[in-house]
Amino acid sequence: MWPCPIGFGMVGFPIFGFFFMGLFFVIGIAVFIIIIITIVDILKRDALDTLEKILWILVVWFLGIIGAIIYYLLSKRNSKSKGDNNGKNIGSN
């Protein structure tokens, strides 16, 4: 009979588990905050109609960080091509 299973006698290695658990927790919270910020940006954008806003929110919600990146890339490209400044007149007083 073994005194303890193989691997459980290693004293310092649980620290790595706690480190990675904390790291993934912080990454998860950061991704969640980015998704919420993206959804707020979608809701504030005047250039999108209601159906487009709903579709973008669904894309961001179900695809997560990938959906947020896609939205960011496509919205920046569209705002440059249309000359949209998100409702702001730059240079006018």
From Swiss-Prot:
One of its GO terms (cellular component) is plasma membrane. Keywords: Cell membrane, Membrane, Transmembrane, Transmembrane helix. The chain crosses the membrane at residues 17-37, 54-74. Its main location: membrane. It is a multi-pass membrane protein. It comes from the Archaea. It is found in: Cell membrane. This is Uncharacterized protein MJ0574. It comes from Methanocaldococcus jannaschii (strain ATCC 43067 / DSM 2661 / JAL-1 / JCM 10045 / NBRC 100440) (Methanococcus jannaschii). The lineage of its organism: Archaea, Methanobacteriati, Methanobacteriota, Methanomada group, Methanococci.
